[in-house]
Design a protein with these regions (language model features):
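Ligand-binding beta-strand-loop-alpha-helix segment within the catalytic cores
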Residues: 71-134
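N-terminal glycine-/serine-/threonine-rich phosphate-binding loop
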Residues: 1-57
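Glycine-rich loop at the start of a catalytic domain that most often binds anionic cofactors/ligands
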Residues: 39-44, 68-77
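Active-site glycine-centered loops adjacent to acidic/histidine catalytic or metal-binding residues
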Residues: 61
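Terminal amphipathic helices with adjacent charged low-complexity linkers/tails
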Residues: 64-66
């Protein structure tokens, strides 16, 4: 990219950067996205938004990971209207899958994004149940 094109690009994007600085974005990621080979690109984009002053709330799914854990344990669950009916035995697999997925996401975000233009960026990662929807 030439200097002139870079300056033009920066001038075109700077109003959007200014408009969204300090705002909070809620991003939902499916469990499939976490397993995808492009997950590192998603992590990079999240780190970039955070470095531009956007606050990120990340909500992740884990259906694929839950299905895998249940299959490994030899357990089956029923669905009613696309909602899993989970008994006590299956709940252990659900907790393991969700915890593992969360750990994978948090570790990817807090690694400092090696081998990328965002190397050394400080991405703050905080996990917990801080917000409840009404």
């Amino acid at each position: 990219m030439t200097t002139q094109k870079y300056v033009q690009f920066f001038r075109e994007t700077s109003p959007y950067i200014h408009a969204h600085r300090g705002k909070t974005f809620v991003i939902a990621i499916s469990g499939e996205a976490v397993l995808d080979s492009n997950f590192d690109s998603i992590v990079h984009d999240i780190a970039l938004m955070q470095s531009l002053g956007v606050n990120i709330v990340l909500v992740h799914g884990a259906r694929t990971q839950i299905d895998q854990r249940l299959q490994l344990a030899g357990l089956q669950t029923d669905f009613r209207e696309q909602v899993r009916i989970t008994d006590a035995h299956a709940m252990q697999c659900v907790k393991e899958a969700v915890g593992s997925t969360r750990f994978q996401i948090e570790s990817a975000l807090s690694m400092g994004l090696p081998n990328s233009p965002m190397h050394g960026a400080r991405v703050r990662v905080i996990g917990g149940n801080f917000i409840t929807a009404k």
